[in-house]
């Protein structure tokens, strides 16, 4: 099987301590963003179809929209982002944060009723929507008694923001400032809010980089996950900026289109995700993927056939991982290729994994025995918004069933159907 020469060279640089993999320490997401804008203003930041923004333009658009947001929402107020994957979504996220607001992310495909359930948990002071879903979001906004702004065509256009060129907002933001609320359905299907301050969110961003280290100003990312999902928020918004990188934005996953974009833009980091995404690309027409070197995967079980076919096609392994909105990335396959089929890799630094008996006794199980997966670590929450603690002694029950191998790899095999958290 032909191995990727690109990947081999990059891993060599990583093993030799090349500073291109090093990141500056930040206590908040806003400082991270503006540092990137100042460090590489002429660098390509966002590409969507035939539209693109440099980091200087990205910053100008963010500053312009932040000024509008500040007229409606005070610092530490809450802004719901309900925009499909787009340049507008990325601008909206950083604009709200730069205005000092806490953001919540909502799936742009949701109905008014589904959005209403999220807004009951975390009532917004302002809702930002895209053109495609402005009517649905508008109905939800009326029900929540919150103002709505459409970002993009039919509302505040990016081009309009670029013309205003306002100064960067002067808002004091610290690691303790509220940052983001993401929603998870858990095993009950009822949404729950996962709330993080800036310091906690930066710990998730850094964990993503630990699992999948990338090169400063050398990568081109392509994300297919919804930006409202924890995977999409990081792979399609936060981590490309953390690496001063270009991001190719895909509104919807279409295998033929994505394969062509990966070739055209020389994509080096593909956010991937579930097995179905990789299977779709395997069925797409041949494309030149020689610039590609990093392919994370997760959210579903990968068959041996899918893993083998992808590696045969690209010379690259799919780096399976296990993560949750409640803790970010938790385990990941080693970059060096020492994978164990059927597992999601080893616990990342700062994360502990335990397996508990399914009888409710709390008894910890040895290797190779199925039980409920428990997680503990600095970025793992202990409670959901407005609900009592669910973690005991720091251990959060995941609702997933799995086992650990004797050398510490985690395998996820099922979902605990009757668990209420």
Feature-to-residue mapping (PLM):
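Gly/Ser/Thr-rich phosphate-binding loop
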Residues: 267-272, 282-340, 352
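Conserved AMP-binding A3 loop
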Residues: 54-56, 179-206
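Conserved AMP-binding/adenylation subdomain of ANL enzymes
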Residues: 202-220, 228-269, 284
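Conserved pre-ATP/AMP-binding loop-to-beta segment of ANL
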Residues: 41, 165-183, 190, 213-220
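Structural core segment of the AMP-binding/adenylate-forming
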Residues: 1, 68-75, 98-161
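Conserved AMP-binding/adenylate-forming core of the ANL superfamily
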Residues: 21-25, 42-73, 80-86, 90-94, ...
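Flexible, low-complexity linker/hinge segments
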Residues: 18-27, 155-178
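Conserved ATP-binding/catalytic segment of the ANL
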Residues: 363-368, 372-421
